[in-house]
Amino acid sequence: MSFDTAKYPTLALVETPDELRLLPKDSLPKLCDELRQYLLDSVSRSSGHFASGLGTVELTVALHYVYNTPFDHLVWDVGHQAYPHKILTGRRDRISTIRQKGGLHPFPWRDESEYDVLSVGHSSTSISAGLGMAVAAEREGKGRRTVCVIGDGAITAGMAFEAMNHAGDIRSDLLVVLNDNEMSISENVGALNNHLAQLLSGKLYASLREGGKKVLSGLPPIKELVKRTEEHLKGMVVPGTLFEELGFNYIGPVDGHDVQALAHTLKNMRSLKGPQLLHIMTKKGKGYAPAEQDPISWHAVPKFDPASGTLPKSKEGAQPTYSKIFGQWLQETAAKDSKLMAITPAMREGSGMVQFSRDYPQQYFDVAIAEQHAVTFAAGLAVGGYHPVVAIYSTFLQRAYDQVIHDVAIQNLPVLFAIDRGGIVGADGQTHQGAFDLSFLRCIPNMIIMTPSDENECRQMLHTGYHYQKGPTAVRYPRGNGTGTELTPLSELPIGKGVVRRQGETIAILNFGTLLPEAQIAAEKLNATLVDMRFVKPLDEALLEELAQSHSTFVTLEENAIMGGAGSGVNEFLMAKRLAVSVLNIGLPDVFIPQGSQEEIRADLGLDAAGIERKITQWME
């Protein structure tokens, strides 16, 4: 996509924030209009996160206009909303490559630009990192300022409050901008969000603000003071807010789409000392009516036609996603068991739980972005005699590792972890690949871990884990569609038993997970035995011993880090039993895997059928 200077005459003048700061203030609204339109044109052609960026156009322009970036540090939380930031910081002409192999990173990324001071992707990290930068800036003594932008969903996480509590204690100069669009990926929950959403419409707030302005503006000597401290008058209306109790000077709420007023407010705040919190109200999807009306569906989008106002529908006959299979299993199980309790940390849509949340609202809990709480909450439900299911992405389960060990596994509580997005996720890059869950779960005592090879096996494993009441279980499945296999009635699988799918000679391919179709092709060409191992823990030790008697080579296959993964478990067993079998471990290498489509990444890593065959052939030479 070439940049059309005639269509975007003001944006054409702004390649970097230095050029932005040369513009007269009255041209900023025009710049925002063009920036929003350019974002729409670009993302509709390339796919990507969409609604969040539309809502932060004015904030992004105002921040770069007022603050001396990159000398001043601007820290974005999560990064979904940072597309306008990328466009204004030297990456305008490459924005159409975002989330693609070799293209712009989907989130702010330190290796990509000096304006991206923190690499992000997971939520609620900005204030902690920003506080560290603010302390470093104080020691440096050069007047560097630090600003953190965090959304109303991300600020509900415990880490954000830990950071604010610390900031209020040490009193470093730090600005936190709370971007309140009343809508994170799933609807926000909890008393804090209700409080924030009600502030702007309060009659007391509005009348006191206007009354205070009239009284003070009638005194000529302090007119300028009124301009500089109007924000403080707003803060006076809500004394004792949670933020002020944490030691922040709370200012707001203010209109996040009035770029000139926002720039004025930020300019005033730049000189304030100590921790400051600016609360802005924005509209997710601002400027594009379909996204404003349905910001959840338009949060992340495929390529689409902006004129149609609709997203492309799934292809007819497409196989169901694993997330949908999970949601259907939840429905089927809840219909028979009122003690099922399903828990998600703010990922209702992505985890396939929308219909379940509507049909079984009393058995559904969205705990917001609070993975640690989600796991320990599940532990409490299990203690109380209920049957909790924690639906969580692999990459986000990392955030609750201690809770899995301390609150669930040590107490041997029957909690089922439905781990979505295991393995290669694709376009979201390093922060979202599900590369480590088998490794970090396998070493936990009492944990049973299952890896389905297709959607029917996924259903059966969820059923098996749910009815296993002797301790915690995990079923780990990928992003994407199933294979089209027939769905059979639910029945419990024997724990720790694999299935031989093909009988061959010399080589036994031990598959863990959904790479089975690729392994099948390689096995046919190599005349290898193919085993669907099903269980990472416990391993089918009897089957491994049997195979070791008739095969000289084992090849373990998994879409997880090789280090510590399922293949490592096979190695450990063979060594412990002194079984003389050569082993090739195939999986994810010891690197953070960048963005690309799932197919591109698997091909690059040799995890497609041709790559698996090639790795085995080369190793056997």
Curated annotation (Swiss-Prot):
<feature type="binding site">
    <location>
        <position position="80"/>
    </location>
    <ligand>
        <name>thiamine diphosphate</name>
    </ligand>
</feature>
<dbReference type="GO" id="GO:0009228">
    <property type="term" value="P:thiamine biosynthetic process"/>
</dbReference>
<comment type="similarity">
    <text>Belongs to the transketolase family. DXPS subfamily.</text>
</comment>
<dbReference type="GO" id="GO:0005829">
    <property type="term" value="C:cytosol"/>
</dbReference>
<comment type="subunit">
    <text>Homodimer.</text>
</comment>
<dbReference type="InterPro" id="IPR049557">
    <property type="entry name" value="Transketolase_CS"/>
</dbReference>
<dbReference type="InterPro" id="IPR009014">
    <property type="entry name" value="Transketo_C/PFOR_II"/>
</dbReference>
<feature type="binding site">
    <location>
        <position position="181"/>
    </location>
    <ligand>
        <name>thiamine diphosphate</name>
    </ligand>
</feature>
<dbReference type="InterPro" id="IPR005475">
    <property type="entry name" value="Transketolase-like_Pyr-bd"/>
</dbReference>
<feature type="binding site">
    <location>
        <begin position="153"/>
        <end position="154"/>
    </location>
    <ligand>
        <name>thiamine diphosphate</name>
    </ligand>
</feature>
<dbReference type="InterPro" id="IPR029061">
    <property type="entry name" value="THDP-binding"/>
</dbReference>
<protein>
    <recommendedName>
        <fullName>1-deoxy-D-xylulose-5-phosphate synthase</fullName>
        <ecNumber>2.2.1.7</ecNumber>
    </recommendedName>
</protein>
<feature type="binding site">
    <location>
        <position position="152"/>
    </location>
    <ligand>
        <name>Mg(2+)</name>
    </ligand>
</feature>
<keyword id="KW-0414">Isoprene biosynthesis</keyword>
<dbReference type="Pfam" id="PF13292">
    <property type="entry name" value="DXP_synthase_N"/>
</dbReference>
<dbReference type="Pfam" id="PF02779">
    <property type="entry name" value="Transket_pyr"/>
</dbReference>
<dbReference type="Pfam" id="PF02780">
    <property type="entry name" value="Transketolase_C"/>
</dbReference>
<keyword id="KW-0479">Metal-binding</keyword>
<dbReference type="InterPro" id="IPR005477">
    <property type="entry name" value="Dxylulose-5-P_synthase"/>
</dbReference>
<feature type="binding site">
    <location>
        <position position="371"/>
    </location>
    <ligand>
        <name>thiamine diphosphate</name>
    </ligand>
</feature>
<dbReference type="GO" id="GO:0030976">
    <property type="term" value="F:thiamine pyrophosphate binding"/>
</dbReference>
<dbReference type="GO" id="GO:0000287">
    <property type="term" value="F:magnesium ion binding"/>
</dbReference>
<dbReference type="GO" id="GO:0052865">
    <property type="term" value="P:1-deoxy-D-xylulose 5-phosphate biosynthetic process"/>
</dbReference>
<dbReference type="InterPro" id="IPR020826">
    <property type="entry name" value="Transketolase_BS"/>
</dbReference>
<keyword id="KW-0808">Transferase</keyword>
<dbReference type="InterPro" id="IPR033248">
    <property type="entry name" value="Transketolase_C"/>
</dbReference>
<feature type="binding site">
    <location>
        <position position="181"/>
    </location>
    <ligand>
        <name>Mg(2+)</name>
    </ligand>
</feature>
<feature type="binding site">
    <location>
        <begin position="121"/>
        <end position="123"/>
    </location>
    <ligand>
        <name>thiamine diphosphate</name>
    </ligand>
</feature>
<dbReference type="GO" id="GO:0019288">
    <property type="term" value="P:isopentenyl diphosphate biosynthetic process, methylerythritol 4-phosphate pathway"/>
</dbReference>
<keyword id="KW-0460">Magnesium</keyword>
<comment type="pathway">
    <text>Metabolic intermediate biosynthesis; 1-deoxy-D-xylulose 5-phosphate biosynthesis; 1-deoxy-D-xylulose 5-phosphate from D-glyceraldehyde 3-phosphate and pyruvate: step 1/1.</text>
</comment>
<keyword id="KW-0784">Thiamine biosynthesis</keyword>
<keyword id="KW-0786">Thiamine pyrophosphate</keyword>
<dbReference type="GO" id="GO:0016114">
    <property type="term" value="P:terpenoid biosynthetic process"/>
</dbReference>
<comment type="function">
    <text>Catalyzes the acyloin condensation reaction between C atoms 2 and 3 of pyruvate and glyceraldehyde 3-phosphate to yield 1-deoxy-D-xylulose-5-phosphate (DXP).</text>
</comment>
<dbReference type="GO" id="GO:0008661">
    <property type="term" value="F:1-deoxy-D-xylulose-5-phosphate synthase activity"/>
</dbReference>
<feature type="binding site">
    <location>
        <position position="288"/>
    </location>
    <ligand>
        <name>thiamine diphosphate</name>
    </ligand>
</feature>
